[in-house]
């Protein structure tokens, strides 16, 4: 299969639909027989990871399968479990695979999105499957970059902004944000919109139509209010120092 970030909508839908739905949980198990319990867990749970302590076992595996085994074990005194999802179709990305990027705690990035060099993803930001983000772009706190969105280089996506994704309907065109665009806090860019190079989207704007390059748009729905001038450039300047690793 091609990389997920290169799949068309129908292929992405098929991938999500056909992916095994998993609920991976971590269990802390108090037991009077850690070695024996660990051995039995490994025998009965093929994909589980088991770690043994002096009087406990830690198990990471499919929730329902682990519970079934633990409930059948007399050596288990009690257990505590941790999980943050249910029937997950697409896992989160392995953040260690991204190079030359900064991902702050609490950011959520799904499997195999594309992040360019120097990308910064702030706390609470969400980047969905199939999205592509160019070099030097910052995704600020609680912003959402939807499925298949294409974001260029040196873009700033403001806090709480939403770049709409396009899996439903599958015929919809993805959002395209060209290079050097600044998107203000809580702005919304709807499906199929292209924002031209160097444009500025004001805070709170709802963009329903394409934005020409080097224009400022504002309002609901967003309308062109002026050209990007020196004053606007000064107010929306991208700071390279914030993208240093």
Curated annotation (Swiss-Prot):
The protein's enzyme class: transferase
SUPFAM superfamilies associated with the record: Trimeric LpxA-like enzymes
Catalytic activity: (S)-2,3,4,5-tetrahydrodipicolinate + acetyl-CoA + H2O = L-2-acetamido-6-oxoheptanedioate + CoA
Keywords for this protein: Acyltransferase, Amino-acid biosynthesis, Diaminopimelate biosynthesis, Lysine biosynthesis, Repeat, Transferase
Swiss-Prot/TrEMBL GO biological process terms: diaminopimelate biosynthetic process; lysine biosynthetic process via diaminopimelate
Coiled-coil region list: none
Gene3D superfamilies on file: Hexapeptide repeat proteins, Malonyl-CoA ACP transacylase, ACP-binding
Pathway the protein takes part in: Amino-acid biosynthesis; L-lysine biosynthesis via DAP pathway; LL-2,6-diaminopimelate from (S)-tetrahydrodipicolinate (acetylase route): step 1/3
Enzyme Commission number(s) from the entry: 2.3.1.89
Single GO MF descriptor: tetrahydrodipicolinate N-acetyltransferase activity
Function: Catalyzes the transfer of an acetyl group from acetyl-CoA to tetrahydrodipicolinate.
Family: Belongs to the transferase hexapeptide repeat family. DapH subfamily.
Protein name: 2,3,4,5-tetrahydropyridine-2,6-dicarboxylate N-acetyltransferase
Lineage: Archaea, Methanobacteriati, Methanobacteriota, Methanomada group, Methanopyri
